[in-house]
């Protein structure tokens, strides 16, 4: 049951649609390298499409009815878009769910120090990373610093053309014999992933008893104060992420792919939001969820295990006049969901890690993973065969190219998504996303055809499920 390459069927008009979609996606990927920025941009997209903040609806005491479009944000890191359909909410929703946090390095709360006449910022890695990926590459600092007076300072240094960049040094090959003999996981100690941020000391009189003990660090702090009006202590209440510097780019002489940071999982989040916005009138209410903390287990107030989704649905059902606890439970259990997350693209260089009959191939369309997990499907959501059949029918009716796959060979490893968390309500859920190469590396690869088919598939699901 080999699936064909999606590129072979495209008309000139479809190629034009594909390129337009991917131009927007490249801009989104380049400009939104943190979950906060993704949500901020998602809200802007929604408002431009006529969505209204749910908090405004509640404050004004308005009722919700079919055709109304609302959004809700959670701590600036989650976003829920809702398009109310003509069917009673109790009959369930059609849901897309993706995450917008990506593997990265986070600054520690007390990060600044000086060593070897250079200023550094200490980090703690976030998510599943290979430490050796992060050395000797241009890096940017993106995030927020929250001050005691209640103000928030946005930080974004390293992505503009005239910005300085940062880096983590690597050991020169001439002195690396011991390092090169270590397993890859030990070659670069995660504790020494320290970002170089300065190399120039402040001027001072050597006889001055008040001269700074760390003059290069002090110069960095002085620059920070001058440019952003923040003190060293403000790092205690900061969330600054170290991410690769530079934009997403077309890849290949044929420009068929995109190289960028954060395809996992913004390559699913962006087409999900677009599909939600582009679907006009629906019978079953459509919902798109953009969430945080998936890379570390979906925990905390902004992870999928929080009550944000459930609470927001309860608010909406109350405003729509369906406010009984039983109606809420029925609505959740009768819902259908595509858990939109990336899959492992088949890589010929590592062919032994895949089983090709059930592998995701680049350019063959939207991926469906009936189950994920590892070592006997542990920790997975295993979609019902009846639901898989329904999804197949929707995709075929809409002419969407899709493929079914697993995340590598049996016992080769594995992974998980938010699917099992949503399935606890009793709703039907299947994992559905885009195949990528170099997953969790600084620069991941996605095929434009797969992004286009993801958008088409997500839109068809919202309209027809």
Language model segments and positions:
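N-terminal hydrophobic/helix-forming segments and targeting peptides
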Residues: 1-465
């Amino acid at each position: 049951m080999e699936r064909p390459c999606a590129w072979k069927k495209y008309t000139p008009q479809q190629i034009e649609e594909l390129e337009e979609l991917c131009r927007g996606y490249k801009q989104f990927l380049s400009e939104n390298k943190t979950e906060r920025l993704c949500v901020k941009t998602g809200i802007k997209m929604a408002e431009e499409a006529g969505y209204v903040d749910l908090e405004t609806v509640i404050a004004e005491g308005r009722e919700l009815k079919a055709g109304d479009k609302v959004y809700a944000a959670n701590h600036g890191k989650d976003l829920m878009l809702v398009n109310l359909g003509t069917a009673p909410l109790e009959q369930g929703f059609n849901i897309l769910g993706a995450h917008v946090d990506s593997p990265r390095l986070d600054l520690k709360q007390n990060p600044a120090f000086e060593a070897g006449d250079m200023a550094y910022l200490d980090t703690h890695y976030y998510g599943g990373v290979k430490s050796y990926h992060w050395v000797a590459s241009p890096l940017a600092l993106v995030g927020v610093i929250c001050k005691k007076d209640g103000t928030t300072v946005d930080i974004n240094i390293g992505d503009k053309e005239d910005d300085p960049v940062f880096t983590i040094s690597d050991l020169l090959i001439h002195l690396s014999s011991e390092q090169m003999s270590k397993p890859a996981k030990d070659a670069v100690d995660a504790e020494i992933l320290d970002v170089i941020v300065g190399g120039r000391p402040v001027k001072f009189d050597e006889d001055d008893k008040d001269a700074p003990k760390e003059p290069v660090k002090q110069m960095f702090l002085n620059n920070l104060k001058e440019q952003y009006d923040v003190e060293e202590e403000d790092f205690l209440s900061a969330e600054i992420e170290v991410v690769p510097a530079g934009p997403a780019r077309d890849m290949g002489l044929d420009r068929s792919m995109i190289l960028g940071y954060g395809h996992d999982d913004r390559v699913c989040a962006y087409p999900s939001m677009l599909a939600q916005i582009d679907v006009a009138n629906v019978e079953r209410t459509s919902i798109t969820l953009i969430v945080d903390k998936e890379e570390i287990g979906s925990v905390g107030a902004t992870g999928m295990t929080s009550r944000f989704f459930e609470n927001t649905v309860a608010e909406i059902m109350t405003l729509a006049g369906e406010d009984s606890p039983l109606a809420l439970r029925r609505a959740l259990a009768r819902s259908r969901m595509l858990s939109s997350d990336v899959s492992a693209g088949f890589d010929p260089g590592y062919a032994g890690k895949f089983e090709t009959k059930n592998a995701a191939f680049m350019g063959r369309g939207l991926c469906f993973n009936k189950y994920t997990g590892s070592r006997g499907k542990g920790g997975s959501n295993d979609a019902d065969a009846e639901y898989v059949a329904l999804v197949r029918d929707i995709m075929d009716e809409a002419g969407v190219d899709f493929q079914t796959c697993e995340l590598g060979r049996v016992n080769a490893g594995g992974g998980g998504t938010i699917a099992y968390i949503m399935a606890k309500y009793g709703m039907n859920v299947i994992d559905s996303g885009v195949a990528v190469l170099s997953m969790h590396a600084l620069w991941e690869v996605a095929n434009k055809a797969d992004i286009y088919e993801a958008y088409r598939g997500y839109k068809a699901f919202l309209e027809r499920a």
